[in-house]
From Swiss-Prot:
Family per record: Belongs to the NDUFAF7 family.
Chief place of localization: mitochondrion
GO biological process, one term: peptidyl-arginine methylation, to symmetrical-dimethyl arginine
PANTHER family in UniProt: PROTEIN ARGININE METHYLTRANSFERASE NDUFAF7, MITOCHONDRIAL
Protein name (Swiss-Prot/TrEMBL): Protein arginine methyltransferase NDUFAF7, mitochondrial
Record keyword Mitochondrion present: yes
Enzymatic reactions: L-arginyl-[protein] + 2 S-adenosyl-L-methionine = N(omega),N(omega)'-dimethyl-L-arginyl-[protein] + 2 S-adenosyl-L-homocysteine + 2 H(+)
Targeting presequence: 1-31
Species annotation: Xenopus tropicalis
This enzyme's EC code(s): 2.1.1.320
Entry superkingdom: Eukaryota
Amino acid sequence: MSGLARLRKTAFLMVSASANCRIQRYQSSRTEKHQDSTSANALLNHLIFKIKSTGPITVSEYMREVLTNPVKGYYMHHDMLGEHGDFVTSPELSQIFGELLGVWCISEWMSAGKPKSLQLVELGPGRGTLTDDLLRVFSNFGRLLNSCDISVHLVEVSPKLSDIQAQRLTGKAIEVELDKNSPVYKKGITKTGFPVCWYQDIQDVPTGFSFYIAHEFFDALPIHKLQKTKDGWREILIDIDPGIPDKLRFVLGPNVSLVANTFVQDDEPRDHVEVCPSAAVIIQKLANQINSYGGAALIADYGHMGERTDTFRGFRAHKLHDVLSNPGTADLTADVDFNFMRRIVGEAASCLGPVTQHEFLKNMGIDIRLKVLLEKSSDVAVQKQLIHGYNILMNADQMGQRFKFFSVVPQSRLKTTMPPVAGFSKLLMH
């Protein structure tokens, strides 16, 4: 049996360090309430004033204001995850999700020849649950990783979420440290003993052999919406409804879109496309870093291969929400165009996927891991929660088909003499 196969088989036999690691995500904490009507009106008034001053704004500018406005932005002051928030993510449902991603990282670290240092970088870490689960796996494989210098780097713009992450990962609050000579605004030591730093921008994360984890990160980046007309591509903008002065509406821009000229291909068959320049900048950065220093990026998100058109939508209290209604009180998202990502990466690195979440987790051995956890627990409530989390992660009408996994690896990684990348090939047990 190969070292990789032994690692993956061993992973399925891991026993949780404590009972509180056993899929009790819904009970972990309650999220805060939504902004009240006064807060929502404040952001709407800000947007209306901006439009009156400078004219209609792009969907990209609207998303940036609604999600990350320093005063009233949706992400800036809210814990929106979990049963009582606006959406639930895979790590909040089941510890197995994060454990398997941790095994994936170790598998790729071994395939790379066990480098002496490893940076775990998560983009948009949410409540810190996924990183926490990953680090627990690293600790469980402490003997294997003993000679590796591991550090954690979190890219987070939300003060509220960074506070929650710090509490979860280190067990205590960490004050913001503003140093003009350093891009790090928080730092500490995790409960598992690894140094952790927080950054506002991916560009500030140190170079080195790194695993970049982006779970439901790219779908929240601002998009431009473009419409094909007889006169060329026009950008869809957001303006004030002339009939209802406190309401916003979509309008078609009057001029040829510069964004379209840059990012839309001449043979684009769709009449409506969504383009994310921010995603292009980030994925290109990751590809260059990975090919130069080693490591990989693992991206999990809603997505497609360039066939979908209008995917811009809002979520509030687990239900679809009008994207232009009460800005700042709902999450805004758009599906990731993985074909666009592949095109941007180009020859800088190699891409794998997308494959469905069901396929990826199946290939990583989720069924075996579930069986082990069920056998190890005599608590009926824990067993039910394990099965409930598994079903949501895997079922086609839940997350199993909707979420996709996509990876960027060094060009050298796909040489035929190397073992296949875990998760993107069928699991073979010997």
